[in-house]
UniProtKB/Swiss-Prot annotation:
Alphabetical UniProt keywords: Cell adhesion impairing toxin, Disulfide bond, Hemostasis impairing toxin, Platelet aggregation inhibiting toxin, Pyrrolidone carboxylic acid, Secreted, Toxin
PROSITE patterns on file: DISINTEGRIN_2 (PS50214)
Purpose of the protein: Inhibit human platelet aggregation induced by ADP, collagen, thrombin or the thromboxane analog U46619 in platelet suspension with IC(50) values of 66-267 nM. Acts by inhibiting fibrinogen interaction with platelet receptors GPIIb/GPIIIa (ITGA2B/ITGB3). It also inhibits angiogenesis in vivo and in vitro by blocking integrin alpha-V/beta-3 (ITGAV/ITGB3) of endothelial cells and by inducing apoptosis.
Signal peptide location: none
GO MF terms, alphabetically ordered: toxin activity
InterPro entries: Disintegrin_dom, Disintegrin_dom_sf
Name by which UniProt lists this protein: Disintegrin accutin
SMART domains: DISIN (SM00050)
Amino acid sequence: QGAQCTAGPCCWPCKFLKEGTICRRARGDDLDDYCNGISADCPRNPYY
């Protein structure tokens, strides 16, 4: 009850992780990707 999500890099446990939580670490010249607090998906940074 009250679940926001069931799976995803920004979902744990059944709640969206708060905005600013790192969900994908930077690789090479890329930047870290962060949860947005409203989705279970990990949005890509605008510079990928």
